[in-house]
A protein has these predicted regions:
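A short acidic, Gly/Pro-enriched loop at the edge of an enzyme's catalytic core
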Residues: 120-131
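Short glycine-centered segments of the SAM/dcSAM-binding site in methyltransferase folds
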Residues: 63, 158-160
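C-terminal alpha-helical "lid/dimerization" subdomain adjacent to the S-adenosyl-L-methionine
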Residues: 13, 29, 36-38, 162-220
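A short SAM/SAH-binding and catalytic strip from SAM-dependent methyltransferases
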Residues: 131-143
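Conserved class I S-adenosyl-L-methionine
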Residues: 1-60, 77, 179-182
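Class I SAM-dependent methyltransferase SAM/SAH-binding core
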Residues: 63-121
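A short glycine-rich, Lys/Arg-flanked "PGG" loop and its adjoining helix->strand segment in the class I
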Residues: 145-157
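Core SAM-dependent methyltransferase catalytic element
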Residues: 204-243
Length: 243
């Protein structure tokens, strides 16, 4: 099953500093991967991540869900600056989440809780969170339609959905690595959004959509309308089929 393949792939990286170095583009090997696969340097890598997380206000004190949390390398230092926030971190991989929990413990974070779970069936009530953050997750989710629905469901009206993930069709070399390496290793799962399909989807589901991309990484910040019934009635665009 695809979910088990994904869990196995991330089991191999959960305790691996190479993964953290690659995600942050901060080690020699990580910088090499960023350049080879993503055609980015560290400044570019930092730029799209900063855009993705700019949807979290300074001194945020509401309820935030991060899915997937991964190893926590990108967000635990940020959460250290948000002592009044109520933060929940969810991941399908217990091995990745263990690394995130260890980082939280080292930073003495008391307002962050962890839970293993599936983004396609979130174990939370409707309208629970003020912010849902998803960094580098949707390109891995096997049931993306369910993930989009669940994120929308648990986000309160007026809440913010922000994050980033891979979009196809922006850089040929990146697309090749995704198709021939990352998919085969179990890290990525088709189908994928394009810049245009993602914009159409977010515009159809949310209001105040701010979105852009840096090469093959799209970032977005959008708000759930308070009149959510009207938004839900709109027909959502389907994924473009990969040729």
């Amino acid at each position: 099953e695809r979910k088990e393949a994904i869990r196995g792939a991330y089991r191999m990286t959960g305790g691996n500093s190479f993964y953290d170095g690659m995600i942050t583009c901060s080690t020699l090997s990580g910088k090499a991967v960023c350049r080879l696969v993503w055609a980015m340097n560290k400044a570019e890598n930092d730029a799209y991540l900063e855009k993705a997380m700019s949807g979290i206000p300074e001194h945020f004190s509401g309820k935030l869900l991060e899915v997937p949390v991964g190893t926590g390398i990108l967000t635990m230092p940020v959460y250290q600056t948000m002592p009044e926030a109520d933060i929940t971190c969810l991941d399908y991989s217990p091995d990745m989440m263990r690394q995130a929990r260890e980082k939280a413990d080292r930073l003495h974070l008391k307002n962050v809780t962890f839970r293993q779970g599936d983004v396609g069936a979130l174990p939370y009530e409707d309208d629970t969170f003020d912010i849902v953050l998803s960094l580098n997750g949707f390109h891995a989710f096997p049931d993306k339609e369910a993930a989009y629905r669940e994120v929308f469901r648990v986000l309160r009206p007026g809440g913010t959905f922000c994050g980033c993930f891979y979009v196809m069709g922006e850089h040929k070399r990146t697309d090749w690595f995704v198709r021939h390496v990352y998919e085969k290793a179990g890290f990525f799962t088709p189908p994928y959004e394009t810049v245009s399909s993602l914009k159409a989807r977010l515009d159809g589901m949310y209001t105040d959509v701010d979105m852009g991309n840096l090469k093959s990484m799209a970032w977005f910040i959008c708000r759930k309308a308070k009149e959510e019934a009207m938004i839900c009635q709109r027909k959502q665009p389907s994924f473009r089929k990969k040729k």
